[in-house]
């Protein structure tokens, strides 16, 4: 009886009040997450999570800058500055952002760093800092272009270092990073993006999903398909003949957000990208999906 009464009382609460409570819970969860990221940053300005400091620092910085803070304003300004300082210090003469001697998958960190630093550049007002970022990103774009394989993808390392091996997840980091640079005013060769788009298409299976690699074809991967579709959207591709098939595949495999979805692995990676895909479909699809996804994430914090 108490449960029934509680349910009825809850249903009697106006929808607006319920929505307001829900949004407050999300905001509180986001703040707790951002505070945790800031608190766990090292004195050198990086994060590691046990490994891959360049990639983890770029991702941590991206989360902080998404809060609205910049290098000079907001509660996370200091942490963002330290992240930028760390990543720019890792820029090498050949343009790579990272350390190939300690990171055997440096392409991830390079791509995530291009994405993060290009967002910082878009908000940066300090003239000297802007000049430094432009130099670092211009070199980074050049490195990425030269690291692309003959097939149009990227591997865990450059084409030269990796004997022309490529695969989907690293390719996606490069395309998003390059797109971020282009949006920030850094010149990006159009042919590099075109080759990358065609690479994604070559990895597409008949069910609409994307396989691991163009050379090592296999079953479709929900995570890579979601990331590839988000990347195509970021590259300005919405109506290509391949996009509807990929969208249908991701909706079938990912839209339910069930616990069983974890069977394909990399759950958080998957929904980082699939949420971008759904957001592009408009409020009617995004709102109910967002509610379910946010509530699940908050419940696991």
Question: What are the residue ranges of the model-derived segments?
Answer:
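Short, intrinsically disordered, charge-balanced linker/junction segments flanking boundaries
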Residues: 300-301
């Amino acid at each position: 009886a108490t449960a029934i009464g509680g349910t009825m009382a809850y249903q009697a609460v106006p929808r607006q009040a319920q929505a307001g409570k829900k949004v407050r819970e999300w905001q509180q969860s986001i703040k707790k997450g951002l505070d945790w990221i800031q608190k766990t940053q090292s004195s050198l300005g990086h994060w590691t999570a046990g490994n891959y400091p360049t990639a983890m620092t770029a991702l941590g910085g991206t989360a902080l800058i998404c809060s609205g803070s910049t290098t000079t304003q907001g509660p996370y300004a200091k942490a963002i500055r330290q992240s930028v300082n760390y990543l720019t210090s890792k820029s090498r003469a050949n343009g790579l952002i990272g350390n190939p001697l300690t990171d055997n998958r440096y392409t991830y960190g390079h791509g995530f760093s291009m994405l993060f630093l290009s967002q910082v550049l878009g908000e940066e007002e300090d003239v000297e800092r802007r000049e430094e970022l432009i130099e670092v990103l211009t070199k980074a774009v050049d490195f990425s272009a030269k690291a692309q394989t003959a097939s149009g993808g990227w591997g865990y390392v450059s084409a030269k270092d990796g004997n022309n091996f490529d695969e989907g997840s690293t390719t996606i980091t490069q395309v998003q990073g390059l797109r971020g640079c282009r949006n920030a005013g850094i010149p990006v060769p159009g042919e590099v993006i075109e080759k990358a788009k065609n690479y994604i298409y070559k990895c597409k299976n008949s069910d609409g999903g994307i396989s691991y690699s163009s050379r090592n074809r296999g079953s479709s991967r929900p995570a890579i398909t979601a990331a590839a579709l988000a990347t195509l959207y970021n590259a300005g591709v919405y109506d290509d003949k391949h996009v509807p098939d990929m969208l249908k595949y991701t909706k079938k495999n990912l839209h339910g957000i069930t616990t069983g979805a974890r069977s394909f692995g990399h759950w958080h990676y998957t929904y980082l990208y699939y949420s971008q895909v759904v957001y592009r479909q408009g409020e009617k699809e995004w709102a109910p999906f967002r509610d379910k996804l946010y509530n699940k994430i908050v419940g696991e914090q």
